[in-house]
């Protein structure tokens, strides 16, 4: 009898049958006590965000960053001439084209070179006065050589000129050799042509 019941019972597979899923849906619909929210809560997960933050992002964690205890960049105050320009810009008067044009011409009339560079040049002039005449000459020659060495634009132009000159010379040599070869071929053809014409004349006279 055990063998007969085993043969009548279907073999269960791993996958769910369509009939079993539809029967479970029908059974859940028949149970009025369960709400839709309970069904959704079974299918979805709830995250405890506060415990995640406490675990992975604690308040005392520094993430490998460190604070820099350096002073901020020093501030250079403006020169007295620039303070007037600043006070003009702080006024609330409306800018007309005439006022703007006057301010632009006044700014253009001032030195175009920044004031810090003027100070830098003055300090370099002091260094030159401390040097002996021989050292000054060496320094001047060194600066000239450095300018020539780092003048890459000029070097590129010179290299291009030399290359183009070499190419032109090669083309001229090729043309001259071709014309010389062509002339020699023409001379040979003309000499052969004159020889054959002489032979034809001799034959015609002898006959």
UniProtKB/Swiss-Prot annotation:
PTM annotation (Phosphothreonine): residues: 73, 92, 96
Phosphoserine modification, residue list: 44, 87, 89, 123-124, 129, 132
Region of interest (Required for binding PPP1CC catalytic center, displacing metal ions and inhibition of PPP1CC catalytic activity), ranges: 149-152
Keyword tags: Acetylation, Carbohydrate metabolism, Glycogen metabolism, Phosphoprotein, Protein phosphatase inhibitor
PTM entry text: Phosphorylation on Ser-44 by ATM activates PP1 by dissociating the PP1-PPP1R2 complex. Phosphorylation on Thr-73 by GSK3 activates PP1 by dissociating the PP1-PPP1R2 complex.
Extent of Basic and acidic residues compositional bias: 35-44, 112-122, 133-145
Compositionally biased residues, Low complexity: 19-28
Compositional bias per record (Acidic residues), positions renumbered to this chain: 80-91, 123-132, 168-177
The keyword Acetylation belongs to this UniProt entry's keyword annotation: yes
Listed InterPro entries: PPI-2 (IPR007062)
Region (Disordered): 1-44, 65-97, 110-146, 165-207
A Pfam family annotated for this UniProt entry: IPP-2
Bias-annotated ranges (Polar residues): 187-207
Region entry Required for binding PPP1CC, spans: 12-17, 43-55
Superkingdom of origin organism: Eukaryota
GO molecular function terms noted in the UniProt entry: protein phosphatase inhibitor activity
Gene Ontology annotations of biological process type: glycogen metabolic process; intracellular signal transduction; regulation of signal transduction
Residues with the N-acetylalanine modification: 2
Family of the protein in this entry: Belongs to the protein phosphatase inhibitor 2 family.
Quaternary organization: Heterodimer with PP1.
Function: Inhibitor of protein-phosphatase 1.
Record's protein name: Protein phosphatase inhibitor 2
């Amino acid at each position: 009898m055990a063998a007969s019941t085993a043969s009548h019972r279907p073999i269960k597979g791993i996958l769910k049958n369509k009939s079993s899923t539809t029967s479970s849906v029908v059974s859940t619909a028949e149970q009025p006590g369960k709400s839709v929210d309970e069904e959704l809560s079974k299918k979805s997960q709830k995250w405890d965000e506060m415990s995640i933050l406490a675990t992975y992002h604690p308040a005392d964690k520094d993430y490998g960053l460190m604070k820099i205890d350096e002073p901020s960049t020093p501030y250079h105050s403006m020169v007295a001439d620039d303070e007037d320009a600043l006070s003009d810009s702080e006024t609330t008067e409306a800018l007309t084209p005439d006022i703007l044009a006057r301010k632009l011409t006044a700014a253009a009339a001032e030195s175009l070179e920044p004031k810090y560079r003027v100070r830098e040049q003055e300090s370099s002039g002091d260094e030159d006065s401390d040097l002996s005449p021989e050292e000054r000459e060496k320094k001047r020659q060194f600066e000239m050589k450095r300018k020539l060495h780092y003048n890459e634009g000029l070097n590129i132009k010179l290299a291009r000129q030399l290359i183009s000159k070499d190419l032109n010379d090669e083309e001229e040599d090729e043309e001259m050799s071709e014309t010389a070869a062509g002339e020699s071929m023409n001379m040979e053809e003309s000499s052969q042509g004159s020889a054959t014409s002489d032979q034809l004349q001799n034959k015609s006279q002898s006959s």
